[in-house]
Amino acid sequence: MVNSTHRGMHTSLHLWNRSSYRLHSNASESLGKGYSDGGCYEQLFVSPEVFVTLGVISLLENILVIVAIAKNKNLHSPMYFFICSLAVADMLVSVSNGSETIVITLLNSTDTDAQSFTVNIDNVIDSVICSSLLASICSLLSIAVDRYFTIFYALQYHNIMTVKRVGIIISCIWAACTVSGILFIIYSDSSAVIICLITMFFTMLALMASLYVHMFLMARLHIKRIAVLPGTGAIRQGANMKGAITLTILIGVFVVCWAPFFLHLIFYISCPQNPYCVCFMSHFNLYLILIMCNSIIDPLIYALRSQELRKTFKEIICCYPLGGLCDLSSRY
């Protein structure tokens, strides 16, 4: 694993390490069939500095999201609590990837004891990444269910989604995902683990799709019903739909950024000897970059879609360190 990393192959799960090993051996076999060393099968190299930089950016952005939600009481709602959980998962994925790059780079050695220590550290980090991936999936699904309740059970929503209940849900998500992530790494030599991850990904997509088909088909009818109620029912329902659209964007970005990695796993399981599959898997480092980009893009989506969150970001970034400057700008 260390030697393959030294050749520019960054890994993030032990099962990915196996994929990288097999990829290298498959590439060597295929090269003997007419492919050159500089061809498609040469593993795409990405500088460790890129992973570290993306990890730092993601860390700062997602900490800002968490602090903003904690600071602003107007954001103390179930949807934003689930977004906070998603931000923690995003942050852990990126920071773990960046940390793994640093660890492997610093401890890269031919010494057997050093390699054994590196593998152990790598497995711990891989467990964090795997747990965070599962938590991201569960958090997105929780946000989808929350949006479903706000639209179809608007009058009973506050009785259904209480703060205490949301806290229990988030705690259960992280407890279950942590245990699952550790077990996945312990038994990562089994192809069943990869199949399980792939199944969870596509099951999540199927559940999201079914929720959204029902949600958007019936949304107009419920908006009309709420509109005849006294008060600001129509305005509230419009805000709920805006939250559903925000979630749609988040899921779309998640799928775009994670799909290449899961396709990589599918190819690893189904066609590890196929030249086209090997060619696709040779860009593994690029798929890791996409995963880290997802963690960077999500906070930007929160900011663009929520005026309240944007305002809180501005207060944290500008008004605290540069209070005098903010006061001066507000006068003019």
Curated annotation (Swiss-Prot):
Pfam families attached to this UniProt entry: 7tm_1
Effect upon mutating N97D: In OBESITY; completely unable to generate cAMP in response to ligand; shows evidence of impaired cell surface expression
Stated consequence of mutating D122N: About 50% loss of alpha-MSH signaling
A Gene Ontology term for the protein's cellular component: membrane
Tissue localization of expression: Brain, placental, and gut tissues.
Residue ranges of the TM segments: 44-69, 82-106, 124-145, 166-186, 192-215, 249-271, 281-304
Extracellular side, ranges: 1-43, 107-123, 187-191, 272-280
Disulfide bonds: C40-C279, C271-C277
Impact after mutating C271Y: In OBESITY; no activity
Membrane topology: Multi-pass membrane protein
Phenotypic consequence of L325F: In OBESITY; does not bind alpha-MSH
Protein's GO biological process: adenylate cyclase-activating G protein-coupled receptor signaling pathway; adenylate cyclase-modulating G protein-coupled receptor signaling pathway; feeding behavior; insulin secretion; positive regulation of bone resorption; regulation of eating behavior; regulation of metabolic process; response to food
Effect of I102S: In OBESITY; shows the same affinity as the wild-type but significant impairment of cAMP-induced activity in response to melanotan II compared with the wild-type receptor
Effect of D126Y: Complete abolishment of receptor function
Disease: Obesity: A condition characterized by an increase of body weight beyond the limitation of skeletal and physical requirements, as the result of excessive accumulation of body fat.
Name of this protein: Melanocortin receptor 4
Species assigned in the record: Homo sapiens (Human)
